[in-house]
Amino acid sequence: TFTTSRGAVSANKVYGTTASNILIFVEAGEEGTDDWTAFGQSFDQDVYSNVTSMWGSPPDTDSNGKVVVLYSKFSTSHINSGFAGYFDSKDLFENESGSNGADMVHMNLYRTTDTRYTPDSTKDTLAHEMQHLIQYGYRHIDRNFSLMDTWMSEGLAECAAHFALNKALTNSIAYYKSDPDGYFRNGFPLIKWHGIAADYVLTYLFFQYIRLHATDGTNIYPQIMQTSTGDYQSIETVMKNQNSEFPTFGDLLLKFTVANLINGDDIYGYGNERTSFDMSSPPAPTSVSGVNLYSGGIMYVYTTAETVNSFSPSGQGTNISYIKVNKE
């Protein structure tokens, strides 16, 4: 029996051997017809090795050398609770109330009331949650660092999902480009976390952008995780040694902003992956007034080249930047 966000859940082991890196449990009666053995072997051999080779080993507080993965219903009515998985740090501390006393992550069985996740469709989420487990173990248990800012923690976890699948998260890119809710064109911030899909999309793009312009490529991710500050200064510290274009975090934000506007083949774009991260169609202009901008928020105003060339900003201050861009 496990403790979950829903309460106590009885579960049966469907995958795990003495040689495996993970143990998979599924809520009793919900095993279905899925081939859990094939999924477990695939995750063990491919995804687990990808995640741990990049981020390091997970903690092993229960001394069994394995990560426990529990698939259960997040709601008794099968209605999706809004997320596909989670990591709960209290599971690592046996004496905490509600702890499972195990290195584990929790996965949702149901996408909607009538639609069940297939195991293969959860690989990216499982990698995401495992990165949270590894990150917490390294920063909080091994080093006693402060917890990382949420937007960064989630951005690094989305990177784990990207490399678990070994491809770009196309749904995230499509969401950014279509901007169906008008978030991005109306000042949605990178750094202020709201806990909605737009947050994950924006921080995912940001961390892919910096990877593509870093000398060390994917190796910057563990470097950022292992930097003690755990905020934007961690990124600044790492990136200013990776590319002379980014002496400050402000420079990084500015160039990331322009990259999402013009899709260049240099620093103002996504480098040799600009086809995957295709930003060639400009975002829609800002559609609301009276926007409160937070760190990383952007507003787009389209006008004539003549107006752009003659524009002189006023009231700019130190925290708001005007960027004039001629796409021609």
Where are these regions (language model features)?
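Acidic/polar low-complexity interaction segments
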Residues: 1-31
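Ordered hydrophobic segments in well-structured contexts
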Residues: 14-15, 21-26, 68-70, 104-108, ...
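Juxtacatalytic substrate-recognition/specificity segment
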Residues: 20-149, 156, 166-170
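Non-transmembrane alpha-helical segments in soluble domains
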Residues: 40, 48, 52, 127, ...
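Acidic/His/Gly-enriched intrinsically disordered linker/tail segments
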Residues: 100, 120, 140-214, 225-260
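Short, solvent-exposed segments of well-ordered alpha helices
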Residues: 121, 148, 194, 198, ...
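Beta/coil-rich, acidic/histidine-enriched accessory regions frequently appended to metallopeptidases
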Residues: 230-328
